[in-house]
Amino acid sequence: MERRDLLRFAASLGAGSVVSTFLSKRGDAQTSVRYEVYGRGPALFLGSPISASNSRPGGDPLAAIRQGYLDRLTDRYQVIVMDYPPTGLAAVGAVASFDPAHVCADILAVADAAGADHFAWYGYSWGGVVGLQLAARTNRLSALICGGWPPIGASYPDMAVVAQWLAERARRAEAQLMVTFYRALEQWRDEEAVSRFTCPRMTFAASGDTITTAGQTIRIGPLIAERKADLERMGWMVHVVDDVRHDLFTRPEVVVPLVRAFLDPVLLRP
């Protein structure tokens, strides 16, 4: 039995399967990403800010949130979670090359290792941006869920300013990764790229999701609400959730029903 088939078999048993795989080289270094596979069914990546379990020193503050997603998804889906973006020394080695092309290559390598030829992607905030980049660069997405980020109309130059401001104060490689990433998107024409997407797609955000940092105001929920008709004409399912802010992803009891209402008719067979 080949390694890919072994992974599929292990996932079908319902237990988490933990595997480390070496991915594309960054200079003289290689990036190792830890990931876990749960459940059985169509493959679904839970991207950032959800990560694989037991991976952070001192415990994982998102463990209960991740479990809330897994409990509501693994009955019908093969859910893949991973430790990404890199942290610690891995982040130091990745700073110079952490652009959207490398990020997508890393994720596709994890998908290969997990035996997922095609997969749905759920990401929130930065994870939502990554989902847009995946949809623009590969035909392997079976569906896209872009949470906490507007698929069209976003100001990536403003995000580059915010990322630089945060990196100067944090003085950590993890923050510098985002500078590299968003600078690479400053000239990206999101509406032109998104208009070419063909996979089923959904976006959602909180109505009160507006972030003011470094003198920049990043409108997420209000912008999605304003562009709702445009997005729907482009084939998107759109949800704006009232009475919450950018931490909407921390409420799987609210988010997963939206995800299932979109994904189930698309990916599940009777």
Annotate each predicted stretch with a short phrase.
Residues 197, 203-205:
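Short beta-strand/loop motif that positions the catalytic acidic residue
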Residues 234-270:
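Catalytic active-site module of serine/aspartate enzymes centered on a nucleophile-bearing elbow/loop
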Residues 102-119:
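Conserved acidic catalytic loop of the alpha/beta-hydrolase fold
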Residues 144-166:
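Flexible "cap/lid" loop of the alpha/beta hydrolase fold
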Residues 118-152:
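Conserved hydrolase catalytic core segment
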Residues 31-89:
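Conserved HGGG/HGGXW glycine-rich cap/lid loop of the alpha/beta-hydrolase fold
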Residues 5-23:
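N-terminal export signals
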Residues 207-237:
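Conserved loop-alpha-helix segment in the C-terminal half of the alpha/beta-hydrolase fold
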